[in-house]
Amino acid sequence: MAEVKQTEVNEKKAVETKAQRVERLKRSKNAWDHFDEIQQFARDGFDSIPPEWLGTYFRSWGIYTQGDGVGVVGGKNGEGKARPFFMVRIRIPNGLLRTEQVRTIATLAAKHGRGVADITVRQNIQLHWVTIESLPDVLQSLWNVGLTTTGACGDVARNITGCPLAGLDGQEIIDASPLALAIDRELGGNSEFYNLPRKFKISITGCRHWCSYPEINDIGLTATTRQRGGKHEVGFTLRVGGGLSTNPHLAVSLNAFIKPEQVISVVRGVAEIFRASEVLRQSREKARLKFLFLEHGWTAESFLAELQQRIGLSLDPGEREEIPADIHRDHVGVHDQKQPGLVYIGASVLRGRITPQQLHLAADLADRYADGHVRNTVMQNLLIVNVRKESAALVAAELTAAGLPVHASVFARGTIACTGLEFCKLALTETKSFARWLTRELEDRLPAFEEQLKLHITGCPNSCGQHWIADIGIEGKKIKQDGRMVDAYYFCVGGSVGQFASIARPVGYRCSAGTVPEAIERLLEGFNTRREGNENLRQFFNRHTNEELRALLAGSSVGPIERDLAFGPVPHGVEG
């Protein structure tokens, strides 16, 4: 009888979908309560780790299994034991760091990560090559300086992003960083929100430039003002349901004015709506909050009504807000702060990759010439803030000499790259080294090009490189060339956030990775010769047809690749 029951259990598991399996595992255990198991794995070695930890539980700890660098994914259910190493993502709310934290990260990268650290598009820092034996030391060292990896990955509230100039920008409406930290304390590591249907991303900013991209977050809070009873009041506009990946969707604006004291209740309420949405738990590919709007009939009005009922508040109607126009705010360079005599210095960190030596230098400079604070940006750059103005030139020179230029080309400043095939098991193409090579090629080919641009590189359809909001976005794929599979990219153009927010437009063109520089060179040369007046890249792309843009990319008229003309569930990846 026992054998029959076990057979039934095995058969039941065998027919589980991926979503059903993940949901079952999440219901059965909150991994945050089981650090002791991680310690035991460290004692027993990598081969002792069961598949459910490798594929599910480690993620809520901010830890992913690392790919093998050539795209091989081993193990059951695609969870992979291809390499016995981990990526460890450090959660850094609003990108705010103290120098002791920077030094700790640098030391860990050198000691456990083969000298590799990556700044991410959510203001985190990732370590690579971490072994299971090293993992407890890495986590404990981070805890000792007030950092954590908890909730940096997995089906939880991810790192809270915000303006890296919070409290420093003379034009900001409000310093929203205290609220960002409060949201992080409310949701980060909170067992009430351990089991969400999928990742949950939140952005809050008090600046006028929306540099934290509220349009692509599950919750986007942007500061606004109103006049009430002769008084000037500051609050927030609320957007929900933004996200990219294979179904890019810009967040929906709700007709509500959120007072600062209501922010936590509102954020919790949205998270509770998401948590309660069982319909989103049926498919991992359609589990983000945006799918309530895309596929389940929700509207801004119905969402607001549900939110107000859930939190027990009647929110004031929204106010007309000032949406920023075409902007490019990478924070690179030397800029005045609102504090007299102080500046912030933004260093361009090409593709987000930074060395332990560079991190130590940034910490040393911040202690010597400022007040010991460093900040990350969503464009994968690094800021030293509160620098005495008389020391700015010296700090800038030292950063530049160390490979962190303060005055960089538009290509270095505007290029974003995801983790790519080097470490990510989902990636189809290598992105980090490719981004460095591509940037240098474009600098050599177009040394006089000065139009600000966002050039985003992503190694698979999941859009971790955010190619859907770039001026020029390229998505990795494989194509057959001379009888073998090679890295290639397909192009989309004209993505934007702010007043003219739009998803980038696929133009039906792809080429091998080796010919991407000349394709972009032709495209930008066409922009230089054909632009009308002072139009920017977004306006130029909007004015030209896909056929015209393909001709610029290819150097001659070419027909479209139909599968590269649309976003959505169409697999853009591997071609025979």
Place the predicted regions along the sequence by residue.
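Peripheral terminal and linker regions in Fe-S/redox and tRNA-modifying enzymes
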Residues: 2-576
